[in-house]
Amino acid sequence: MVVKTVRVLNRAGVHARPAALIVQAASRFDSKIMLVRDTIRVNAKSIMGVMAMAAGCGSELELVVEGPDEVAALSAIERLFQNKFEEE
């Protein structure tokens, strides 16, 4: 299992488009991928779950990945956050 804290850097937060990018990236991997914000824990492969987090700009999320391709999965999703979901 690998765990990393990521921060939402884009101004609009995790709305529909960034949520779709997260789900699309997560779905390419066999690992179980969870996003955690405060007491909310969601499957990163679920568009409704990711959007329900309502993570605004500046929010910190814990990315928890467990499985055979966990390092690659963590890296791919972390890159989305670092690149502000290519919105800015």
UniProtKB/Swiss-Prot annotation:
Signal peptide: none annotated. It is found in: Cytoplasm. SUPFAM superfamilies: HPr-like. GO terms for cellular component: cytoplasm. Keywords: Cytoplasm, Phosphoprotein, Phosphotransferase system, Sugar transport, Transport. It comes from Treponema pallidum (strain Nichols). Gene3D superfamilies: HPr-like. General (non sugar-specific) component of the phosphoenolpyruvate-dependent sugar phosphotransferase system (sugar PTS). This major carbohydrate active-transport system catalyzes the phosphorylation of incoming sugar substrates concomitantly with their translocation across the cell membrane. The phosphoryl group from phosphoenolpyruvate (PEP) is transferred to the phosphoryl carrier protein HPr by enzyme I. Phospho-HPr then transfers it to the PTS EIIA domain. Residues 1-88 form the HPr domain. The modification Phosphoserine is found at residue 46. Phosphorylation on Ser-46 inhibits the phosphoryl transfer from enzyme I to HPr. This is Phosphocarrier protein HPr.
